[in-house]
């Protein structure tokens, strides 16, 4: 025991001497860092100041600081990590995802990525390098290519038709109050799960109610723990006092068990199906060393987490804005009636001929990006962002929400004006799906399902607000920024609807 105590004392003394020498002789040169808000405290830095909603708090900080670069970059100390927050489109597009795109293509490592994200090996969390490039190539070609998306057109078409039929039965030709969020969630969950597994989990013709509840709970739990990180990620000593990592470990075990079950079910079937898991298992036979079960589970995880809540939230915000702007919904309906007609449902192939509908989707993504703070990036080496030095290891947060409401970038930025996107170059300013080599590869799928669902709802029903007051547009708490008050609206089927869905 005495020998152990002596070793501890000696280790402490040598560690202290090393720190003193390092500080005196290896002190880094003074760097030009972006301005930082007051209120920094030892150990925790600015963590105590980050009140939800974080994207609004960060914009508030940024607006109070003097920026010699014309605005848009500030620094924070979050525990042991240096974090830069960018709130300028010019800086994000030119400096971060232009000139420094490769340097900033890394991801900071967080606890949930380790225990739920298969030790940071999935496409979102993986460090930039050969493994990530292989994953990106796999997803681009085998999952999100035009060919693969077209293979699942029947799923999107069928799920939207089921949504329309469900609403038609509820409302009929009489004005009826409906709550839309549960139906929109069912739509997006079923779309992704049918692509991956061939199963409908929600609504009619479902296969396993208990498994459906399990899926939704897992997605909610992972989403609740996924953002820019937990305080434990920034102040490692908190691991000694927090149960966070143990909770995440348990969540990772539950998630892995569920995903492995999906793969085993498909592997046990005698005939090869047409789902995404079937396709990945065929690829596994050709290269078993690369297409491991872990790789496949990571892909399923990202598809489910990134492709369900986000699209449902976008649809709910879009409908909320339309109800507050009846002139916009009238204009969109006229466009659909003129170009599609009244004798058939809108189809995905029609979307390219409906520019105003597309502009409504873009304007919704501008005002209500489902990920207001883009997935964090990390500098793999020293670089410069404008006139500022960015040391290696710095975390980068891009506040897409603030950029989308920046008056230096947008005219009347807080107003809902789909017409602004009649100028094609305006769409290039959007950051809803990120920029650069780590932009979201699933943007095409998201825009297809949102465009088709929204167009169908406009085409098939007349919509009104409940009461005379405008729809409440307050933001709720959550990683994908849902509405604080779920949307309820008055719905009435248009006279021709029963003919085209019978």
UniProtKB/Swiss-Prot annotation:
Name of the gene this protein is made from: CYP81D1
GO molecular function: heme binding; iron ion binding; monooxygenase activity; oxidoreductase activity, acting on paired donors, with incorporation or reduction of molecular oxygen
SUPFAM superfamilies xrefs: Cytochrome P450
Cellular location(s): Membrane
Source organism, top-level taxon: Eukaryota
Top EC class of this enzyme: oxidoreductase
GO cellular component, one term: membrane
Coarse class of the protein's main subcellular location: membrane
Protein name stated in the entry: Cytochrome P450 81D1
Keywords on record: Heme, Iron, Membrane, Metal-binding, Monooxygenase, Oxidoreductase, Transmembrane, Transmembrane helix
Cofactor: heme
Recorded topology in the membrane: Single-pass membrane protein
């Amino acid at each position: 025991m005495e020998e152990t105590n002596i070793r501890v004392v000696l280790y402490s003394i040598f560690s202290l001497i090393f720190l003193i020498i390092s500080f005196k002789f290896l002190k880094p040169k003074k760097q030009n860092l972006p301005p930082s808000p007051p209120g920094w405290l030892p150990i925790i830095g600015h963590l105590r100041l980050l009140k939800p909603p974080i994207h609004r708090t960060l914009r508030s900080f940024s607006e109070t600081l003097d920026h010699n670069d014309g605005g848009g970059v500030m620094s924070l100390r979050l525990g042991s990590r240096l974090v830069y927050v960018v709130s300028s489109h010019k800086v994000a597009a030119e400096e971060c995802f232009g000139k420094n795109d490769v340097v900033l293509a890394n991801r900071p490592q967080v606890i949930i990525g380790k225990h739920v994200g298969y030790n940071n090996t999935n496409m979102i969390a993986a460090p930039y390098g050969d493994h990530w490039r292989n994953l990106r190539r796999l997803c681009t070609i085998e999952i999100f290519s035009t060919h693969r998306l077209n293979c699942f057109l029947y799923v999107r078409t069928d799920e939207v038709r089921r949504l329309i039929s469900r609403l038609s039965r509820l409302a009929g030709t009489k004005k009826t109050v409906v709550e839309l969020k549960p139906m929109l969630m069912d739509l997006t969950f079923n779309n992704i799960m049918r692509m991956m597994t061939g199963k409908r989990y929600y609504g009619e013709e479902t296969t396993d109610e208990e498994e459906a509840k399990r899926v939704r709970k897992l997605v909610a739990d992972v989403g609740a723990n996924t953002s820019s990180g937990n305080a434990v990620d920034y102040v490692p000593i908190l691991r000694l006092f927090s149960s966070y990592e143990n909770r995440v470990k348990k969540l990772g075990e539950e998630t892995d068990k569920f995903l492995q079950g999906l793969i085993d079910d498909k592997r046990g079937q005698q005939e090869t199906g047409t789902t995404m898991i079937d396709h990945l298992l065929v690829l596994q036979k050709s290269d078993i060393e690369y297409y491991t079960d872990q790789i496949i589970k990571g892909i399923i995880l990202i598809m489910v987490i990134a492709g369900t809540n986000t699209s449902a939230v976008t649809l709910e915000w879009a409908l909320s804005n339309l109800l507050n702007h009846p002139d916009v919904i009238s204009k969109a309906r006229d466009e659909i009636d003129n170009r599609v007609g009244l004798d058939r449902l809108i189809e995905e192939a029609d979307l390219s001929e409906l520019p105003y509908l597309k502009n409504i989707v873009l304007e919704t993504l501008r005002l209500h990006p489902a990920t207001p703070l883009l997935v964090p990036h990390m500098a793999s080496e020293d670089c410069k962002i404008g006139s500022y030095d960015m040391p290696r290891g710095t975390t980068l947060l891009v506040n897409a929400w603030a950029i989308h409401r920046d008056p230096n970038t947008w005219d009347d930025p807080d107003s809902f004006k789909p017409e602004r996107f009649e100028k094609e170059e305006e769409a290039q300013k959007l950051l809803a799906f990120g920029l650069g080599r780590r932009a979201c590869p699933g943007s095409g799928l998201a825009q297809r399902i949102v465009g088709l669902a929204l167009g169908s709802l406009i085409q098939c029903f007349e919509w009104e607000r409940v009461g005379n007051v405008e729809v409440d547009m307050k933001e709720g708490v959550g990683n994908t920024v849902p509405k604080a008050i779920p949307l309820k609206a008055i719905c009435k089927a248009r006279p021709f609807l029963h003919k085209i869905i019978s």
